Amino acid sequence: MKILVINPGSTSTKIAVYENETPLLVRNIKHSVEELSVYPQVIDQFEFRKNLVLQELEANGIPFEFDAVIGRGGLVKPIPGGVYEVNEAMKRDTLHAMRTHACNLGGLIAEELASSLPHCPAYIADPGVVDELEEVARITGSPLMPKITIWHALNQKAIARRFAKEQDTKYEELDLVICHLGGGISVAVHQHGRAIDANNALDGEGPFSPERAGTLPAGQLIDLCYSGQLTKDELKKRISGRAGLTAHLGTTDVPAIIKSIEEGDKKAELILDAMIYNVAKAIGGAATVLCGKVD
């Protein structure tokens, strides 16, 4: 079976081609803030990212012949983890999603490419809205704002299964804390194959990341909302997109930040240390959900 895999992220587009379990092509195309800023909305990147996929296939001499196409799942309605075929209902949910992120393009691009091939289905797997939370984890300090979780379920569950295989056991038999470090950062508690707690890594919970603010002081955020300084859309971008490292240092490029630290940039060192500190604190907190008994 020949499979095309498409993973659009906030700072990259990952592309792979597999013949059964053998990788024939693996590419990770990085995108700068400037490159993506020409598109007013994430959905406007559809043709750009789709054409990147086609260009990579052509550049590497891979014929456009596949048995299945799978894309990163979008921010549809909350669902349990698993593999889902893209259908009209999923496309509608994705196009009218309450939140925007590049992952919304994954299933749409997969379906568009698959539809041009005979008998080729399009799938998504473990989208970022996977919801397996314990009920106690949903409760916040305000009944107006129950916890929702948007996290890197695809990568986290893949890593969990790989770790289980390395340990000669099953994901469903392990208790794990897993952290995804990318444009956004998510920390989740996996108990016997279910992610019973995870932060909302997209719009305002957990550690700050290369392009997201993470948890912010609620009072100061309210004051900023009513200050008249920023519009609603501008405020949202200060939480996700133009926040975190890019707000402090003007870039999401961690290797470049490390290089500037090596050259004596003390501000960059402090900001990067602060991100690492917050990530470590979140991992430690997640371990308490399992009473410290982490495999």
Model feature map: region roles:
Residues 237-291:
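Adenine-nucleotide phosphate-binding core of ATP-dependent small-molecule kinases
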Residues 53-67, 166-169, 283-294:
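Phosphate/pyrophosphate-binding loops at sites that engage ATP/ADP/AMP, CoA/4′-phosphopantetheine
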Residues 48-60, 109, 159, 278-283:
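Short, well-ordered amphipathic alpha-helical segments that serve as non-catalytic structural scaffolds
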Residues 105-112, 124, 139-175, 183, ...:
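Glycine-rich phosphate-binding loop plus the immediately following alpha-helix
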Residues 3-44:
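Short glycine-rich, Thr/Ser-proximal phosphate-binding strand/loop in the N-terminal lobe
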Residues 57-103, 121, 129-141:
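Short beta-strand-loop/turn "lid" adjacent to the catalytic site in phosphate-handling enzymes
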Residues 2-6, 66-70, 176-180, 186:
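Short glycine-aspartate micro-motif
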